[in-house]
């Protein structure tokens, strides 16, 4: 009788543990913006082969750089107003809070790789422009042209359309009608219309990636070639910690995609992580970030992905007539393949 009555008691802790495992969100976890499946797979392979969260983020973003995801990541896309493709990237370690980033990187294809070298081999956070290229070469990266026939054609067509759209305002000649060079009107009294950006809504498809290792270590990163026909030297939100992405082992991680010139003003990734630190569900945290920006820029294009320390994840986006749903990729220990998920924009 004693043996029979003790058996259920002995099983209680085991059954409780099993129930808790099923109810908790599984780790490891990879989440990235947009349906960039191969990037998700590359990150997962890095984890499966014993790599760290940083290794996974670097591998995933590097895959998109090689594949030129959606023309908005890597070489051969988004030429600036001079016809040059430049790259921004960042990687962040949520354990040490170290960050490595590059902005306006020229003639180096593997931007996320250079960003990691900044993290590992300097005490700096961000290197930019030609100096970032010099650093990359010292780290063994190859200096090569990032332009392609496709990017050159995009630029030629833009010039033929009188440089429309562009990102200038309050200058002469009128940027809504003519190409530059531009200059401030100075003391000349001229009726210069306020220039309204007419960007392609899908022209900001940065890859942002969040990885949570099975040990709980968290990393996040980004890579992009920015926006088409940007002013030469422009750096977006992607390489800015707290804007493009943010990671903290004690709270979670987030990454943003969209109009970087607006997003960076609100540090959405940092804000989302802080919401999760307070106990907000990842989806709610993402929605709150979007709502904060909406109050000032109701027509902005943008989305955010979030994941907390348990592996729960979510996303949110700003609803526009041309953008009503946001797609992102998820891979965790319960899935046998990367899965595309969608959220309705708010």
Curated annotation (Swiss-Prot):
<keyword id="KW-1015">Disulfide bond</keyword>
<keyword id="KW-0325">Glycoprotein</keyword>
<feature type="disulfide bond">
    <location>
        <begin position="317"/>
        <end position="345"/>
    </location>
</feature>
<feature type="glycosylation site" description="N-linked (GlcNAc...) asparagine">
    <location>
        <position position="38"/>
    </location>
</feature>
<keyword id="KW-0458">Lysosome</keyword>
<dbReference type="Pfam" id="PF01112">
    <property type="entry name" value="Asparaginase_2"/>
</dbReference>
<keyword id="KW-0645">Protease</keyword>
<feature type="active site" description="Nucleophile">
    <location>
        <position position="206"/>
    </location>
</feature>
<dbReference type="GO" id="GO:0005737">
    <property type="term" value="C:cytoplasm"/>
</dbReference>
<keyword id="KW-0732">Signal</keyword>
<dbReference type="GO" id="GO:0005576">
    <property type="term" value="C:extracellular region"/>
</dbReference>
<dbReference type="GO" id="GO:0006508">
    <property type="term" value="P:proteolysis"/>
</dbReference>
<keyword id="KW-0225">Disease variant</keyword>
<feature type="modified residue" description="Blocked amino end (Ser)">
    <location>
        <position position="24"/>
    </location>
</feature>
<protein>
    <recommendedName>
        <fullName>N(4)-(beta-N-acetylglucosaminyl)-L-asparaginase</fullName>
        <ecNumber>3.5.1.26</ecNumber>
    </recommendedName>
</protein>
<feature type="disulfide bond">
    <location>
        <begin position="64"/>
        <end position="69"/>
    </location>
</feature>
<comment type="function">
    <text>Cleaves the GlcNAc-Asn bond which joins oligosaccharides to the peptide of asparagine-linked glycoproteins.</text>
</comment>
<dbReference type="GO" id="GO:0003948">
    <property type="term" value="F:N4-(beta-N-acetylglucosaminyl)-L-asparaginase activity"/>
</dbReference>
<feature type="disulfide bond">
    <location>
        <begin position="163"/>
        <end position="179"/>
    </location>
</feature>
<dbReference type="InterPro" id="IPR000246">
    <property type="entry name" value="Peptidase_T2"/>
</dbReference>
<comment type="subunit">
    <text>Heterotetramer of two alpha and two beta chains arranged as a dimer of alpha/beta heterodimers.</text>
</comment>
<dbReference type="GO" id="GO:0035578">
    <property type="term" value="C:azurophil granule lumen"/>
</dbReference>
<feature type="binding site">
    <location>
        <begin position="257"/>
        <end position="260"/>
    </location>
    <ligand>
        <name>substrate</name>
    </ligand>
</feature>
<dbReference type="GO" id="GO:0005783">
    <property type="term" value="C:endoplasmic reticulum"/>
</dbReference>
<dbReference type="GO" id="GO:0005764">
    <property type="term" value="C:lysosome"/>
</dbReference>
<feature type="glycosylation site" description="N-linked (GlcNAc...) asparagine">
    <location>
        <position position="308"/>
    </location>
</feature>
<dbReference type="GO" id="GO:0005615">
    <property type="term" value="C:extracellular space"/>
</dbReference>
<feature type="signal peptide">
    <location>
        <begin position="1"/>
        <end position="23"/>
    </location>
</feature>
<comment type="similarity">
    <text>Belongs to the Ntn-hydrolase family.</text>
</comment>
<dbReference type="InterPro" id="IPR029055">
    <property type="entry name" value="Ntn_hydrolases_N"/>
</dbReference>
<keyword id="KW-0378">Hydrolase</keyword>
<keyword id="KW-0068">Autocatalytic cleavage</keyword>
<dbReference type="GO" id="GO:0008233">
    <property type="term" value="F:peptidase activity"/>
</dbReference>
<feature type="disulfide bond">
    <location>
        <begin position="286"/>
        <end position="306"/>
    </location>
</feature>
<feature type="binding site">
    <location>
        <begin position="234"/>
        <end position="237"/>
    </location>
    <ligand>
        <name>substrate</name>
    </ligand>
</feature>
<dbReference type="GO" id="GO:0006517">
    <property type="term" value="P:protein deglycosylation"/>
</dbReference>
């Amino acid at each position: 009788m004693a043996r029979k009555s003790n058996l259920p008691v002995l099983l209680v802790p085991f059954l409780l543990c099993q129930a808790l495992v099923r109810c908790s969100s599984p780790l490891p976890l990879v989440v990235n913006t947009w349906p960039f499946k191969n990037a998700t797979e590359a990150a997962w392979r890095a984890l499966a082969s014993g790599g760290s969260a940083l290794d996974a983020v670097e591998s995933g973003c590097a895959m998109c750089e090689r594949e030129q995801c959606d023309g908005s990541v890597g070489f051969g896309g988004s030429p600036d107003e001079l016809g040059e493709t430049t790259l921004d990237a960042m990687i962040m370690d949520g354990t040490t809070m170290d960050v490595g980033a590059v902005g306006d990187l020229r003639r180096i294809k593997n931007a996320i790789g250079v960003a990691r070298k900044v993290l590992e081999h300097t005490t700096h956070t961000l290197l930019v422009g030609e100096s970032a290229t010099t650093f990359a070469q010292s780290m063994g990266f190859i200096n090569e042209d990032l332009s392609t026939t496709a990017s050159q054609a995009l630029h030629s067509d833009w010039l033929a359309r009188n440089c429309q759209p562009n990102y200038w305002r309050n200058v002469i000649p009128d940027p809504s009608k003519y190409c530059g060079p531009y200059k401030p009107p100075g003391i000349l009294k001229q009726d210069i219309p306020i220039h309204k950006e007419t960007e392609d809504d899908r022209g900001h498809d940065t890859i942002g990636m969040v990885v949570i290792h099975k040990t709980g270590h968290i990393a996040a990163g980004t890579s992009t070639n920015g926006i088409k026909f940007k002013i030469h030297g422009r750096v977006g939100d992607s390489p800015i910690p707290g804007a493009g992405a943010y990671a903290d082992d004690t709270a979670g991680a987030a990454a943003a995609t969209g109009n970087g010139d607006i997003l960076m003003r609100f540090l959405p990734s940092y804000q989302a992580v802080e919401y999760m630190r307070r106990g907000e569900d990842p989806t709610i945290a993402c929605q709150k970030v979007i709502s904060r920006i909406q109050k000032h820029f109701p027509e902005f294009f943008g989305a955010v992905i979030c994941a907390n320390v348990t592996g729960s994840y979510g996303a949110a986006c700003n609803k526009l007539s041309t953008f009503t749903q946001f797609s992102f990729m998820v891979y965790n220990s319960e899935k046998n393949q990367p899965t595309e998920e969608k959220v309705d924009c708010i």
